[in-house]
Amino acid sequence: MFIVRNVFRCKPGKAKNVLDKFKAAFPLMEGVKQRLLVDEVGGFWTVVVEVEAEDMAAFEKLLKDRGSRQDVQDAMSGYMDFIESGYREIYRVVA
C-alpha cells in the first residue's frame, strides 16, 4: 500500500481557488481513496492532495485515467494558474 501526496504551493491568496477545483473534481473520481488537506501552520497557501494506492502501477493507472476524462479536465481547468510550485511525496505503508 502506498500513500501519495501531491503538495501544491499556491500563489498568495489563491489556495481557496485550488481547493474549489479539487472539491469539484473529487466526486467525479469514484472509488479513489483520497483526501484534501490545507496548511494549518507552516508554509502559507499550501494544498495537499493525498491518494491511497495499492501499488505504484495502480497509481499510474489512476493518473492516466484521470487525465483522459473530459469531466475531470473540465473541473480542473485553469487550476495551474493558481499554483506557484509543487512536489510529490510517495510513502510505502508498513504498519
Summary of predicted features, one role per range:
Residues M1-V72, G78-A95:
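Short S/T/G/P-rich N-terminal loop/turn motif that feeds into the first structured element of a domain
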